[in-house]
């Protein structure tokens, strides 16, 4: 059974008791994080599912309320004892954005694997039982 947990669904500004955009998906013990807004680490900690076993992160787009929590999340992931590679999926220019944010977390005990997915060409990512596809949507 697929479990879906909204870790944060607030707008552009974090409020007490409401974190920015992040969703954690779990199926058969495998987990994927979708977006990583501020407060994502707190949401995961409160949920109690743990950090080390998160298989991948999918970034939907590069608005700050969807990615500003990435450096802290990566540091927490490193402090959890993770040494296996961690995959980040996202639209172009994924490497540019992740490398810029990773300046805050330059030395991690695991490698980051980047998988750029574009809605302009057929592309598909896979992690465990999850299949990730990019599709165009309107977002205001």
PLM region spans:
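Binuclear metal-dependent hydrolase catalytic cores
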Residues: 1-140
């Amino acid at each position: 059974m697929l479990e879906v947990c909204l870790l944060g669904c607030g707008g552009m500004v974090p409020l007490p008791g409401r974190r920015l955009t992040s969703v954690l998906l779990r199926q058969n013990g495998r987990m994927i994080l979708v977006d990583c807004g501020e407060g994502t680490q707190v949401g995961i900690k409160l949920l109690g599912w743990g950090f080390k076993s998160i298989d991948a992160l999918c970034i939907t787009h590069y608005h700050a309320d969807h990615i500003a929590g990435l450096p802290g999340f990566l540091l927490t992931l490193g402090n959890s004892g993770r040494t296996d590679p961690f995959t980040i999926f996202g639209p172009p220019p994924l490497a540019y954005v992740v490398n810029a944010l990773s300046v805050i977390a330059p030395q991690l005990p695991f490698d980051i694997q980047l998988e750029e997915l574009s809605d302009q060409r057929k592309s598909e990512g896979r992690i465990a039982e999850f299949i990730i596809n990019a599709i165009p949507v309107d977002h205001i």
